[in-house]
Amino acid sequence: KKEPKRFYPNGSLAANVLGFVGLDGTGLAGIEQVYNEKITGEPGKVFIEKDSRGRAYESTEVAGRPGQTVVLTIDQSIQYQAETALTMAIEQSGAKAGTAIVLDPHTGEILALANAPTFDPNDVGAASPAARNNWALQNIYEPGSTFKVVAFSAAIEKGLAKPSDTIDCQMGSITVAKRVIHDHHPFGTLTIADALAKSSNVAAIKLGLRVGDPTMYEYITRFGFGSRTGVELPGETAGVIRPVSRWQPSSIGSVAIGQEVGVTPLQMAAAFGALANDGVRVAPHLIREIRSAGGGSSYRPNPEQRRVISKQTASALRGMLEGVTLNGTAKKAQLDGYTAAGKTGTAQKIDPKTRTYSKTKFVASFVGFAPVNDPAVVIIVVIDEPGGAYHGGDVAAPVFRQIAEQILPEMGVIPDTDFKNPELVARAVQTPAEISKMRDEEKRRDEDVREQESRDSTMPRVAARDNKGGEIVYAVATSNAILMPDLRGRSVRDVARACAQLGMQLEARGEGGRALGQTPGAGAELRQGEIIYVDFGKLN
């Protein structure tokens, strides 16, 4: 007897978002767990009446309720780029773990949510607990300097400072309630804008002192810190923000520079989304819609929108954060063809043995957006315990750049500065018609993806829509569970291994590199021993 079995055609892609199911098909993590009842539906039932001899004489059949299709905001290509860049950074730096999130600041849609290490939901048993952990929303960290935007925003919003004002950074040292705090460089007098660009602790603390404890706490919570974002995934933490009543006299000196607080990467991405979206924070979310078995939409999200700061203050912060990439600590986040703004963070971790800040373990981060005047995306990159270089500007900022330079042209975002790389020029000058044609070709390559579930299965798709309204399948159910995975972007070796595991024959075409196209398309049903045709070449 063949039993329905969950299969994930894209392997580990977006695994921490999708989650996985148990042997009985019940969702145990991720979207699978949260929407298990909607996805699974209800099986049909047959009631049989028998006589005293056990012979059936009447039966009543109750039809099953087909499951619904959950459509995600995740963009397959953007997710792939984020995972690739993050994994490369983790391997090169020897880091313990990391996360990268790509967010649309205007809609709150999460376009990519990547974690490293990760796992293949088709083989959950081989994954370590650390790989199954969704670091983007379950682990908290002290944000360090990325948190300084709260003090700067509050001071400007309250009229206590302007970007052009000057502030004495006291040659890199300030005392708060007998605690001495230093800058990484002995700065003298700087403008407020330059103080943020150079990430002066002294300036941030002075602005925090101007604002005061209660107002500082108010703006921390306005930006969404201390509360769950409400994203549709299990296990999200609210972070750690102590009420003002529990602050010490020296706490403002710590909080203003991102110490004594614990946040998640998703919270930080949403906070910068408010700066990118003219001061309005839109709650991040992963569900675009839920569709009934008949194809109609049964649910569309209405994310919370909340004004955090004025449009004028947000505009001022965007300009100041652009200075961070141009003249400050995030020069490695500068983009080819696009303006960028953001903030670096380098936070010391607490040593559990001494309960003091470690001198060898750090969390490096960068969160920013591009283009500056009309941001299309917010991207946050957080690297836990990198080896060697550990500053956010050296470790995380280059990952932001790699992701942004790949996805912005693909999204059709119009460049707002000069290009240096001719390959990026060619990609960015595509007309809307050319972009549409490219996506149509991608859609045709995937036309074999199953559009409806077989009647004997009550486990439908977890999917995402592309910009043309097409559907990318992330998880499917089938009576024999042999479906074609998406091989695009994989090496010859990985493709050969996948085909061997499926019991299929591989016919490779081209001269090495990465898989560019395949026949059959992702999600198509396969016959045992079927020939798989894969075209290889260099990725643009």
What are these model-predicted stretches?
Residues 50-61, 74, 105-145, 150-383:
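Beta-lactam-recognizing serine transpeptidase/beta-lactamase-like catalytic domain environment
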Residues 337, 402-540:
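Ligand-recognition elements built from short beta-strands and adjacent flexible loops
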Residues 14, 25, 78, 85-107, ...:
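Flexible, solvent-exposed loop/hinge segments and secondary-structure transition points
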Residues 11, 15-19, 29, 33, ...:
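Solvent-exposed, polar/charged alpha-helical surfaces in well-ordered, non-transmembrane soluble domains
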Residues 373, 378, 386-387, 393-417:
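C-terminal, active-site-flanking charged/polar segments
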Residues 5, 95-107, 168-171, 233-237, ...:
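Acidic/histidine-enriched alpha-helical segments
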Residues 1-67, 381, 398:
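Small/polar-residue-rich segments within soluble enzyme cores
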Residues 1, 55-98:
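Conserved, well-ordered alpha-helix/loop/beta-strand core segments that scaffold catalytic motifs
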